[in-house]
Amino acid sequence: MLGRKTTGSVVCASCGSLVGVNDDKCYSCGRANPGMWGFAPLLRQFGNDLGFVPFVMGASVVMFVLSLLLSGGIQGGGLNLLSVSSYALRALGASGAGPVFDEGHWWTVLSATWLHAGLLHILFNMMSLRNIGSDTVHIIGPGRTVIIYVVAGVCGFLLSSALGAAVPIIAMLPLPIFILRLLVGAQLTVGASASIFGLLGALVHYGRKSGSSLIHGQAKQWAIIMFVYGLIMPGIDNWAHAGGFLGGYLTSAFFNPLTRERGDHVLIALLCLVASFAAVLASVALNWSTLAM
């Protein structure tokens, strides 16, 4: 039956145990607000992650296809197969020191999360999201997961853009060249990885606060592996990863994942998604005269 259930029991989406529809948490697995204000039976039809992962993946794929079309179709080969032009990325809202500080397009810290530079880029990020996103939704709730995902992306791109703009200052430091290169942020940056690192940061915080060494250890291990991979591989924005992780950790601490998820959390999550969509539209509108040619 479609609608809100106000009495009785529902099935916890995380562990499958029966819980009261108005219980603050599942006493089997600890999930906050397992009844989802009575909408749990309806929301379960969207999957165990309540639609978060399919939504993000779908939106990212749509933006990737649009960026390919703006790039003129299939470009590159091998590891660079289906690469997207910098023109297309800028037109749809890429972030970095150039767009944010040189051009004043501050809203791109919201839109860049939904863009990817090539086929391997989006495949790797979406596989990571599939593994991490569902667990985050189960543990801290869908509303807070969306908030963390968006805010972490903003934090990551702000940090990377700021360090990208600080290149003249960083270059003056009396440090070896390889250290200086590690300190420099990005001039142009896109991708969901900053937000994904934010989810890992949130899980690390939850593990510490709840005393779950398993969640804390697994999330920290994921973060370390992905960060080291970013140091080894060229062209990866590690400062966005670091900023995203920190943003996710602090946002999780602010919203306290051990408490029941509230209606205003879902409202804030919707506002975050609307702001992200508006940021993409702002970049498109700014470049419309060029795009229409």
Where are these regions (language model features)?
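C-terminal transmembrane module of polytopic alpha-helical membrane proteins
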Residues: 1-48, 230-293
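Cytoplasmic-side transmembrane-helix entry/capping segments in multi-pass membrane proteins
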Residues: 146-150, 192-195, 214-221, 269
